[in-house]
Structures are given as C-alpha cells and as structure tokens.
Amino acid sequence: MEIKKLLSGIKVGNCETCKNENCNGKLNYDSLCSNVNYLKEYGEQNYEKNRETFKELKKIMGEQKPAIFSFGCGVGFDYIGATENFGSKVIYYPIDECRWAIMDTENYKNFEPKLPKRIIKFNDGIMLLSMTPNNAVLCFFNSLFTISQNTDLKNKLLLALKSKNNFYFVCDFTVNNNFHLPTVEQDFIYDLLKALKIKFTFKKFDILDGKGIIILGNKR
C-alpha cells in the first residue's frame, strides 16, 4: 500500500519549525497537519504490522469468517490488511471516539484500496460485539493501553463476551515515542482472561516476534 497517495497534494507545516503547541510533535485528531505528519512517520509500518497480524490470524482461523472489531481503528489501515487476508466481504467494525481530519479529504474518500467511511463509537461497538455469537475478533492495534486507561473496558468486555461460543483477542503491544507500554497491556489481558476462565478455555499465539499476541477463547 502506498501511503504517499493518501497524502499527495496536502500541504502541511514542518513540525520542527511549527509553533502550534496543539499539534507540534503530537497526534491531534482534529488537525490535518498533525494527521499527515503522523502518517508520514508511522502509517506504512502500522499497515505492514496489521497485515502481518491478520496473516497469522488467518492461519489460526482457516476458513472461518471473522467479525472484526477494531478498537482504536484510527484511519482504518487495518481494514486493508483484513481484506487482503480474509477477502473483500469481511465484516469490519471501525471503533473509535475520534474521527481523524484526513478522513474528510478527497484523498481519503477516493483512496484505493477503499478505507472505512464511518466510525463507530465505543459504546455502540461494545453493543454490536455483544450481539455477535461466533468468531468475534477483538483487535487492539497500538490502542489497548489508551482505551483500557480511559474507559471501563474490562467490565464491558466481560459482559459482552460471557455469552460467546468463541472469540479471538488480538493485540499489537503499544510503543509510543520509544516508551514501551506492553507490561500494562499484558496485565490487562491477564486480568481479563482470569475473570473469563470459568467459562472459556484459552490458547495463545505469540506474533510479531513477541510484540503482539492472538488469544483464542472457546466456551467450555
């Protein structure tokens, strides 16, 4: 995927000289300049990581069809990785509280391959998750730390997952500005599985050279 096509023709400032404290060196969802500079730096590598994760998930799921819940989906690059591995008719729910400014540009709307046009709010995503009995895939790509620290994620997932026949929990551990956060995320996952183990058995698969994990939960 060529990220440069998405950014082509969009003129933005230089972070090294910009004096805007709300944007300079930070990811500000409402700022097109911030969006573009972030995607220049991280967009391609995030896409590659997501695609590799879905490749591993495909090996585990085989011919089963996933219902993907992408928590903290951003601009939805993981949707492309999902369709490349599971086909264009994959069920995909882009869940985020913030809509990126770049999503309202013609570049985004006309980008090929297609990117998500809508964003589902967190509580609505949890509701849809609770209504999906089989093969729900909960994806947290660089997002589990932030979401778990700012929402009642654990309790909401416990309620949504308790009636499932099976589910997949997919996490690429978060790394921000060389500050590693996987310990917090690993603790969250451990606590979640501990609370669910009375109803489910689990199988774990390390991915991305230990920088991520896929967990299959099957009802007892």
Give residue spans per PLM region.
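Class I SAM-dependent methyltransferase Rossmann-like catalytic core
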Residues: 26-60
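S-adenosyl-L-methionine
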Residues: 106-132
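Conserved beta-strand signature within the Rossmann-like core of class I S-adenosyl-L-methionine
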Residues: 165-176
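Class I SAM-dependent methyltransferase SAM/SAH-binding core
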Residues: 84-116
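N-terminal auxiliary segments of SAM/dcSAM-dependent transferases
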Residues: 1-24
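A short SAM/SAH-binding and catalytic strip from SAM-dependent methyltransferases
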Residues: 136-151
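Class I S-adenosyl-L-methionine
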Residues: 184-220
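Conserved SAM-binding loop of SAM-dependent methyltransferases across substrates and taxa
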Residues: 75-87
